[in-house]
C-alpha cells in the first residue's frame, strides 16, 4: 500500500519500536467467500509486549480494516503512516469530529484531537494517490500531522483499536466506491465529476435490478439515448435536409464556375443562402452533435476508474481495453454504417470521410471496453434515429413534390426574388 514504508508500524517508547527485533509468528490467512473478504492475522512479541494485528482485505476497493490488540504493554501506542512512496510534499490533513479540516503542506506540524479521519494526499489526478485513516467501532484517535517532502501521520491509539485505511488513487470514483466522498474537505468534484457521480449511482441502481455490469452499461446507453433523442432530432433533420440540397448546391456552383467577379460571387452566395432557407436547413442544428460529448467524457472517466467485480461475455474487465480487439472491429463497421446513412446521397463525401474513421479506430483499441460498448450501442441507436428522420424528411418533401429526384435537371426551387418560379419550397 505504501511502497518501501513501514505502514501500520507501532511505537511506544522502549516497549515497542519498528526498528527493534521482534519474535514474529507465521501469518494466518483466512478467506471467507460468503462474506467476500480475506483476513490476515499477524502476531509478534517485543520486550514482553504481545501484539496482534488483523488486516481485512475488501474486493473492488483499496481499503483495509486494521484491528490491533496490545497486551502487557502501555495503554496507548502510536501507529505510523509515513508518506506516499515516491510522492513529493503531499498534503497532510485531518478533521476532528464535529470540526473543520486542518492541514499541513510543506514544513510544520499540527496536532488534531479525536479525528473523524486523517489523510495524506497528492494533488488530484489520474496518477495521484492518497492514504486515508478512519477510526472504527468507537476508537478515539489523536494524530500529529508532519509536513515535509514525504509527510507523516502519527496516530495515537488505545491498546485495542480498529481503523479503516484507504491506500489508492486520489480520484473521485475510487473514493466514492470506498465510501469517502462524503467526508468533509477530502475531495471536491468538478463539473465532469458531478456527472460521473450521477452516472455511477445510476449504474449501481441498474445493477441491483439487472445483476450484470455489461447489461448495465447497455441499459444505461439506451436510457441516455432516449433522454437525448429529442435533442438529437434537430441535428438529424439538418443532416437529412443537407443530403437533399447538396446536389442543388453543386448545380449552383457549376452555374457560376469560372465567374470570379464580385457580382457573380455575391449572386452565388445569395442563391446558396436562399436554397438553405427554402429547404429549411438550419446550420445551428449541428450544435446538438456536441451534446453527447460531456456525457461521453464523464462516462469514460467513470468506467476506466470503476472497480467491476465481473466481466462480460469475452471481456474480462470492462474498465480495460478489449484484449481480443473484437469491439474495435465492430466499432469500425458501425461507424462506417453511420457515415453511410448520413452521406448516402453523396458517395464522394462517404469516400472522403471513411478514412477518418481509421484514425478513430485507435481510440477503440485503447478505450476501456465498457466505453467502447457504450459508443457502439449509442451509434447503432443513432443510425436507427437517422434512418427514421431521413424517411420523415423525404416524406415531407415528397408530399409537396419537393424531393431532389422530382426537381428537373438544371432547375431548383427558386428563391422568392426569382421572376420565374419553378416549385415552391416546403413551408411550415
From Swiss-Prot:
Gene Ontology biological process terms in this record: protein insertion into membrane; protein transport
The UniProt record lists the keyword Protein biosynthesis: no
Membrane topology according to the record: Multi-pass membrane protein
Top-level taxon: Bacteria
Gene3D superfamilies: 2.70.98.90
GO molecular function: membrane insertase activity
InterPro entries: YidC/ALB3/OXA1/COX18, YidC/Oxa/ALB_C, YidC_ALB_C, YidC_periplasmic_sf
Keywords on record: Cell membrane, Chaperone, Membrane, Protein transport, Transmembrane, Transmembrane helix, Transport
Cell compartments where the protein resides: Cell membrane
Stored NCBIfam families: yidC_oxa1_cterm
Subunit note: Interacts with the Sec translocase complex via SecD. Specifically interacts with transmembrane segments of nascent integral membrane proteins during membrane integration.
Purpose: Required for the insertion and/or proper folding and/or complex formation of integral membrane proteins into the membrane. Involved in integration of membrane proteins that insert both dependently and independently of the Sec translocase complex, as well as at least some lipoproteins. Aids folding of multispanning membrane proteins.
UniProt name for this protein: Membrane protein insertase YidC
Species of the source: Deinococcus radiodurans (strain ATCC 13939 / DSM 20539 / JCM 16871 / CCUG 27074 / LMG 4051 / NBRC 15346 / NCIMB 9279 / VKM B-1422 / R1)
Source species taxonomy: Bacteria, Thermotogati, Deinococcota, Deinococci, Deinococcales
